[in-house]
């Protein structure tokens, strides 16, 4: 009898010790599964396979924080976003647990990075995103301006008869030879350099202005560097913008700088809409000071010809912020963004992040291990959080089968994939994982 009592005492002590405590794993941090949200999209089929073993993934399909479900605002510790939603300080303050934001793309002007840093939120981007696509699209715009293919197509669609030499001269008026022309690039990062390589093949003389770039790059690419914006504008037959938008270069192209450009120069912008004062550009196009312009980005997006200062501007080509897009680029960007979120979860913020853009403003917050244990939602992977609750948005024709989840009072979204077994422990920063090993891209360096 005494022996039985002794065993009971031992079991009681063991139960008290283990109650509510996960067993320690020596090779990594101990923390619950965090909630990660894709803010302005509804397809997270690429992100889920990378994150599902250590995080709950939801998508919001929102265009503003007013459309984001309060569960995401209260519990999401990671967020991924495109360029179609803007996060100001006021918006960022609505997130109660947010630690990291990854912009799926290179630009981050739609996030107040200073406010984010002061709130302890790291902001990352994908600087290698869609470099080739953006460079190719830029060259297409430049060639279009010089060879006027868009206007020739429009003339034929409108029934213009083009048979005699005189008719050809009339309809193709303004077409120009490229060889020997000078292309000026404002900003000479990854995309600017890719444009320079392509432009040289067409016979352009290339020069650039970039006050942040170290000397020597121009020698390796066989281009010329100028050290003032005025010099670039004065010497260029075509000016193309390839810089980020910030408080220092808003409306970089304005009435004053346009007057410094060569008479009849071309302007191309596939960077950020806020770099160009569209009112000044429209006036310059009407007066002929600028011969033609091609814009992929605009001050107000989504862009419409029906409104705004450009609606009556001549010799203008506009595309809807699509210079970056290809299926391959989109896939690589999304994989890289999810991998950056994975680094944040398994490592330290901001030290473990590869592309943190607001370290100078960053304020350290509590470690991941103190996240509320109630914020564990393994059954909600791929759920839709959208205000008002209960509404699930599905694209026409449906999405690839990768969504599952429950919305309180709403419509369940399911798929026929096997249930994912979620491990209780995330790997340490130094422990290799199949996602970290297989999904790194050399061009992220």
Swiss-Prot record:
Cited InterPro entries: CtBP (IPR043322), CTBP_dehydrogenase (IPR051638), D-isomer_2_OHA_DH_cat_dom (IPR006139), D-isomer_DH_CS (IPR029753), D-isomer_DH_NAD-bd (IPR006140), NAD(P)-bd_dom_sf (IPR036291)
Signal sequence interval, chain numbering: none
Active site feature: 272, 301, 321 (proton donor)
UniProt GO BP: negative regulation of DNA-templated transcription; regulation of transcription by RNA polymerase II; white fat cell differentiation
Membrane-traversing stretches: none
Expression sites by tissue: Isoform 2 is specifically localized in synaptic ribbon (at protein level).
Main location group: nucleus
List of residues that carry Phosphoserine: 428
Cellular compartments per GO CC: nucleus; photoreceptor ribbon synapse; presynaptic active zone cytoplasmic component; transcription repressor complex
Residues reported in the UniProt entry to bind NAD(+): 106, 186-191, 210, 243-249, 270-272, 296, 321-324
Region (Disordered): 414-445
Basic and acidic residues: bias regions: 434-445
Localization per Swiss-Prot or TrEMBL: Nucleus; Synapse
One function term, GO molecular function aspect: DNA-binding transcription factor binding
Gene3D superfamilies, per the entry: NAD(P)-binding Rossmann-like Domain (3.40.50.720)
CDD domains for the chain: CtBP_dh
Keywords, comma-separated and alphabetical: Differentiation, Methylation, NAD, Nucleus, Oxidoreductase, Phosphoprotein, Repressor, Synapse, Transcription, Transcription regulation
Asymmetric dimethylarginine: residues bearing it: 22
Quaternary structure and partners: Interacts with the C-terminus of adenovirus E1A protein. Can form homodimers or heterodimers of CTBP1 and CTBP2. Interacts with HIPK2. Interacts with ZNF217, PNN, NRIP1 and WIZ. Interacts with PRDM16; represses white adipose tissue (WAT)-specific genes expression. Interacts with MCRIP1.
Known function: Corepressor targeting diverse transcription regulators. Functions in brown adipose tissue (BAT) differentiation. Isoform 2 probably acts as a scaffold for specialized synapses.
Similarity comment text for this entry: Belongs to the D-isomer specific 2-hydroxyacid dehydrogenase family.
Name of the protein in its database record: C-terminal-binding protein 2
């Amino acid at each position: 009898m005494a022996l039985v009592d002794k065993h009971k005492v031992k079991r009681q002590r063991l139960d008290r010790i283990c109650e509510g405590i996960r067993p320690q794993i020596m090779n990594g941090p101990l923390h619950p599964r965090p909630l990660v949200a894709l803010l302005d999209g509804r397809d997270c089929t690429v992100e889920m396979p990378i994150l599902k073993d250590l995080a709950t993934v939801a998508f919001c399909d929102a265009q503003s924080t007013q459309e984001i479900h309060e569960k995401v605002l209260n519990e999401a510790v990671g967020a991924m976003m495109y360029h179609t939603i803007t996060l100001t300080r006021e918006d960022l303050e609505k997130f109660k647990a947010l630690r990291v934001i990854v912009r799926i793309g290179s630009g981050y002007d739609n996030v107040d990075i200073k406010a984010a840093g002061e709130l302890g939120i790291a902001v990352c981007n994908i600087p290698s995103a869609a470099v080739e696509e953006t460079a190719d699209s830029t060259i297409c715009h430049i060639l279009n301006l010089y060879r006027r293919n868009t206007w020739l197509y429009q003339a034929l669609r409108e029934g213009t008869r083009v048979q005699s030499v005189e008719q050809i001269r009339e309809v193709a008026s303004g077409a120009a030879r490229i060889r020997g022309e000078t292309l000026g690039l404002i900003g000479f990062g990854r995309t600017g350099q890719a444009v320079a390589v392509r432009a040289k093949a067409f016979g352009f003389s290339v020069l650039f202005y970039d006050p942040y770039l170290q000397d020597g790059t121009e020698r390796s690419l066989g281009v010329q560097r100028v050290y003032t914006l005025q010099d670039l504008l004065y010497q260029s037959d075509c000016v193309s913008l390839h810089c980020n938008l910030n408080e220092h270069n808003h409306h970089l192209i304005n009435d004053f700088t346009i007057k410094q450009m060569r008479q009849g120069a071309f302007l191309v912008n596939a960077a950020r809409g806020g770099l160009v004062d569209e009112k000044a550009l429209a006036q310059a196009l009407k007066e002929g000071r600028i011969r033609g312009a091609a814009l992929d980005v605009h001050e107000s997006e989504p862009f419409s010809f029906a409104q705004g200062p450009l609606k009556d501007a001549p010799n203008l080509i506009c595309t809807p912020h699509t210079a970056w897009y290809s299926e391959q680029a989109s896939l690589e960007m999304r994989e890289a963004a999810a991998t950056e979120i994975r680094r944040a979860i398994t490592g330290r913020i901001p030290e473990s992040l590869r592309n943190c853009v607001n370290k100078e403003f960053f304020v350290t917050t509590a470690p991941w291990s103190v996240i509320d244990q109630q914020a564990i939602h393994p059954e909600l992977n791929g759920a839709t959080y959208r205000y008002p609750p209960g509404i699930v948005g599905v694209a026409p024709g449906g999405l690839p089968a990768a969504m599952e989840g429950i919305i309180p009072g709403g419509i369940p979204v399911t798929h026929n994939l096997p249930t994912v077994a979620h491990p209780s422990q995330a790997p340490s920063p130094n422990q290799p994982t199949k996602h970290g090993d297989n999904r790194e891209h050399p061009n992220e360096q």
